[in-house]
């Protein structure tokens, strides 16, 4: 939730004049244990962009957010500054976790879904000039998010749910929830700590049916997201939502 709040859907600029950038630490391991406190490696990215790539969550698993860091030359330092004399910081661990929650698409309540993937569709382009070795500018050129949902209910593809021709998905009627965990159970539905994603777009059949001998068949639907006629965003995210 914190990453989604900070990155948004199209990324966050890294600027060394207003923040220290991003540092990735690599702990050195000797044959008989870890190295001394100041002999580890670090990679520092002082300027660039950090961009969300995809969010995935499967039945009984925790949601995962993947992102890319695209560094550029900041005018003084290389795009990536390497040090082999780094001291490791104290790592802060956030125990918050989310998993699959209720899903409504095309004003239909889905059942028997097993996997959700949101590809944020961010295409990043870097460039430079004057024979610079490192890239000197970066931009998100396109943002074309898609949602893929896999389930084991063949009735998704029926006249009473989703026809093979697909249907419209709208923020006014549809939502995807990520349910927050609490120990071995879940946070109460009425507590505003869940994640709600509301999409606009067109739902289509990704794979009407896939099955093997003695295996449960699967069905896949895809939602191509886009801005609606009122100018609402392709996908809205609320990280402090109750489930309704």
Name each region found by the language model.
Residues 1-244:
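Signature of extracytoplasmic/envelope-associated structural regions
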């Amino acid at each position: 939730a914190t990453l989604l709040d900070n990155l948004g859907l199209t990324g966050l600029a890294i600027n060394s004049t207003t923040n220290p950038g991003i540092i990735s630490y690599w702990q050195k391991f000797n044959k008989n244990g870890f190295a001394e406190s100041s002999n580890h490696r670090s990679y520092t990215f002082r300027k660039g962009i950090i961009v969300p790539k995809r969010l995935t969550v499967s039945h009984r698993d925790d949601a995962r957010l993947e992102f890319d860091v695209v560094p550029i030359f900041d005018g003084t330092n290389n795009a990536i500054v390497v040090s082999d004399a780094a001291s490791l910081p104290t790592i802060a661990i956030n125990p918050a976790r989310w998993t699959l929650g209720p899903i409504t698409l095309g004003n239909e309540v889905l059942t028997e879904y097993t996997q959700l993937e949101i590809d944020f569709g961010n295409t990043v382009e870097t460039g430079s000039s004057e024979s610079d070795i490192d890239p000197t500018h970066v931009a998100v050129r396109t943002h074309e998010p898609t949602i893929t949902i896999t389930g084991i209910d063949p009735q998704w593809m029926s006249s009473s749910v989703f026809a093979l021709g697909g249907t419209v998905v709208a923020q006014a009627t549809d939502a995807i929830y990520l349910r927050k965990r609490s120990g071995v159970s879940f946070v109460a539905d009425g507590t505003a700590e869940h994640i709600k994603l509301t999409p606009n777009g067109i739902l289509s059949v990704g794979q009407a049916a896939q099955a093997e001998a003695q295996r449960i068949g699967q069905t896949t639907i895809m939602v191509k997201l886009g801005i609606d006629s009122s100018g609402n965003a392709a996908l809205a995210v609320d990280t402090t939502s109750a489930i309704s």
